[in-house]
Structures are given as C-alpha cells and as structure tokens.
Amino acid sequence: DVLMEADRRGMYARDVLSSRASAKAIDQRDSAFAARLALGVAATQGILDELLDQFLDKPKKVAPRVRMALRISTFEMLYLHTPGRVAVSQGVELVRSGAKSAAGLANAVLHKVADNVEDFATASDVDESERRLVRLSRLMGLPRWLCARILASFDTPEGALNFAGNLAPAPLALHENAFATKPDPYISQLVAPVFPGCHAPVDAQVTVASGVFERAAAVASDLNAQLIATAATRPGRCLEIGAGRGTKTYVMMCQAKRAGYERQHTALDLHDRKCDQNLARLHKAGIKGVRTVSGDACELNEVLTSFDAMLGEPALFDTVFIDAPCSGTGTMRRHPEIPWRLTENDVTCELPKLQLTMLKEAAARV
C-alpha cells in the first residue's frame, strides 16, 4: 500500500511511511522490515522490472498492484538473498490477496526469477563488453546511464563500488533548536554535537519515537546540508531561495542565534503550502523573525514587488542563499525513487539552465 500510494501520488515512499500512523502501532522489527522492503523496492524498481519483464509475456498489461507485489518478492531474492522457495511462496500469497486470478501468473514468473536470479546479478546474461557496467548497475540498483556517469567520475573503477552503499539506510542527523527555553529530554541524552547544534549520527527509530520532531525541538537534516546552511549564515539581511518546508531556514536561524547575529530572514519558495509549513514549524519552535514569500525565483522582480515598494527601491540583501532544484542524487539513500524519476537530459540540460537563471536573478539582489 505504501508503494502504491507513493507511485500514484508522486510522493517519496519514506514520506508515505512517515505519514502512516498505523506503521507506529506494529512491532518495531516488523515496521523496520516493512520500511526496508518499501525503500528497497523504490530504489531498485527499474532493475526489478528488467528481471521480471524477461518472464512476462505482456509486461505492459500487468496490473500495477500485481507488478508491485512481484517487485517485492524479486527484491527479496535479488538483494536480500531470501531463499527462492520462501520468496516465491510469499509473493504468490501477496498477489493472491489483491488479485486472486493472477496467482498462477505470479507463481510461474517468480519461479523463473528464482531460477535465474544469480545469473542476472552477475550479468552473465549480457555481452561481455557490457558486463561490468550492467553488473554494477544491478548491484547498485541504479539506471545504467547514471552508473556510467558515476564510473566516469572516479579515478579508479574500485572507487565506484562505494556507491553500492546506495541501498543501505541513510544515517540520520538532527539539528537542535537554539531557541528552546529548557533542555529537551531526548537531546539531553545524546553525546556532544559534532558542531554547534548538529547531532550525528543518531538512531533513527529511537529518535522518531522520542517525538523530538513533533515538538520542533529539532529538525532532521543531513550533516553536510547543515554544514552548508551554517557556512551561509551571516549577519544582516538574508534571502533564502528554494526554502521548501524550511529545514535550512530552521538551521540558519538557530546558528544565527548561537552566533549572536542581528539579521532579517526572508524565505522564498515556489509553493504557498511549503511556505505555510515552514512558518508553522518555526512558530512551534519559538523561532521568530522570518518572513516567507511564494513565487518563481526565475522572476524575482515580480516576486519581490511588495518588498521593493516598501523600500522605494529594489530590495538588496547581505546574503542570498540558493537551494536550487538539482538532480537530487546526493540524497538517493534518503529518497531512493530519485534515480528512476530522473533523466539524463534533466542532468545535462534542463536543470543547469534553470539553476543558471535562478543564479542570475539572485545575483542582482546582493
């Protein structure tokens, strides 16, 4: 259900998991395994389909729910090394629970997957000239074109194997609220921060269960993202472009508080909904002094019309921080669907053009 909802609504599986209250009511081990399956299938969906489609007579006519069930069992065999007989049996029952008439198809296809999974994993089914790239693509669960670019970016072929960790759970880091009026009971138990406000890594399940995020005592943010936001925190007026739901807004405001900076912060995002979410979390955390504005950062003059009118001249800022739309490949472990929603044209053409336009617009406001 999590995977179907994520696929149908264009969401990330991790976000769907977080929103499911029922997931918190089941045993922790069951919950962790369910999350492992959901995120793993999301991360490797293209590879799983490549294997499955070899044994489906009419791949495009397979019902979405049936395909998703087949993906789950195939993921278990290919990446979790679940014995074939176990994965096949579970997969057939899963298909039967949602589409009884497709149980026979599932049984036949999954038995063929079990018989061929080892050859597929080692890429012995492809020409030797392509075997290395295909094997790495299947190992990493990534599109072939992306694997080729990763290989080209390393000095040695062995270096690319680091990306095999793409399928491992991403470490969780959090940033502590500097505006809190009293110590948070959970954060007080943690070891000293890596740098001011940043605790990493922390146990994901324990941290989420503590309620620290619900009470806005901290935000979840990758360590490197916190470093970037911290480096961009300066006194004076700041325009944050691409603020989203405000994770970096939160971090920058907290770091400014710790540094004793006097500043005014304007957070801009394309979507009204995200601006509202940003302000709601800041309010809950007791963080004041942030204004939000929604609009297209490629048309800053239009977006900042009210600011300019207030000043009687174009508004200028001491710092402009741009979190521009990007490939997202730096967060693949956290949002594993990204590689399969991305095209090579996005990386080489569309995204760079958008980023340059945003940069030019922002440069006129410094």
Regions found by a protein language model. Name each.
Residues D1-V366:
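S-adenosylmethionine
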